[in-house]
Design a protein with these regions (language model features):
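Conserved donor sugar-nucleotide recognition element shared by glycan-biosynthetic enzymes
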Residues: 42, 72, 154-157
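Alpha-helical cap/lid subdomain in secreted, periplasmic
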Residues: 77-227
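Serine-esterase "nucleophile elbow" of acetyl-processing enzymes
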Residues: 2-68, 80-87
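Residue-level signal for threonine
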Residues: 44, 71, 198
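Short gly/ser/thr-rich secondary-structure transition/capping motifs
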Residues: 7-11, 73-77, 111
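Active-site micro-motifs of SAM-dependent methyltransferase domains
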Residues: 33-34, 55, 69, 99, ...
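Short beta->alpha linker loops
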Residues: 67-70, 177
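Short N-terminal helix/helix-N-cap motif within the alpha/beta-hydrolase-1
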Residues: 36-37, 73, 102
């Protein structure tokens, strides 16, 4: 038998015998994934999402690869390889804010996002969820003079995220509309640094993602939200 064919058949058979309560969740992205602004690791949005997954999959594992300051090129170079090796069932991607701040070319961002999603789809069996960039224009840490400019550019980045997720047939979570709705009325959703979400903000973020996960994997009657 051809070695490549044998390996392919072996992996399929191995997957059939995977215990039903095992589940691997990999979170990729920037400081929002790492949880900057939260009061601790258990209050990050990946940890809150994982807590809901754990209700259904007792032996589930979370691997949080998020790093502060990461642009999409950093996610590809520093996180993608690890994510593939972990053989995830679910991958969430939160990236783009640092590309906006560091003026990554829109064409480059588009190409990198397409590459990131397509490699994950090709080399893993994971369901992929990508969130767009929350509205940054109302954040206290953003100088007023830059708010209009950032809002215009943000819409362009989010348009790319929408187009690429649709093209690649992965799930888009719309955090932009949600953050725009709450930014002015609920300042407690923003942490003391004036930039990142607070515990409450991350809980709201997590619930938006959990809603999507329920439709993909979980028993809707048993899974509880985190906020």
């Amino acid at each position: 038998m051809n070695i490549k064919l044998f390996k392919k058949v072996f992996l399929k058979i191995k997957k059939l015998f995977k215990p039903a309560d095992k589940f691997t969740y990999v979170a990729m992205g920037d400081s929002t994934v790492e949880g900057i602004g939260s009061s601790g690791p258990k209050k990050t949005f990946p940890a809150l999402v994982f807590a809901s997954i754990k209700q259904e999959f007792k032996h589930a594992k979370l691997h949080n690869l998020g790093r502060g300051g990461a642009k999409i090129s950093d996610v590809i170079s520093s996180q993608l390889g690890s994510a593939i090796q972990l053989k995830p069932d679910l991958v969430t991607i939160s990236v783009g804010a640092n590309d906006l701040r560091n003026r990554t070319k829109l064409k480059q961002f588009r190409n990198d996002l397409s590459q990131l999603i397509e490699v994950l789809k090709r080399k893993t069996d994971a369901k992929v969820i990508v969130n767009n960039i929350p509205d940054l224009s109302h954040l206290p840490s953003i100088p007023f003079v830059f708010r209009i400019y950032s809002k215009i550019l943000l819409k362009r980045f989010n348009q790319i995220i929408q187009e690429q997720t649709h093209k690649s047939q992965v799930i888009l979570v719309d955090l932009y509309s949600q953050s725009k709705l709450f930014a002015n009325k609920y300042p407690e959703f923003i942490s003391s640094d004036g930039l990142h979400p607070s515990d409450t903000g991350y809980a709201l973020w997590a619930n938006t993602i959990i809603t999507q996960i329920k439709h993909l994997f979980l028993n809707k009657q048993q899974i509880k939200t985190q906020f």
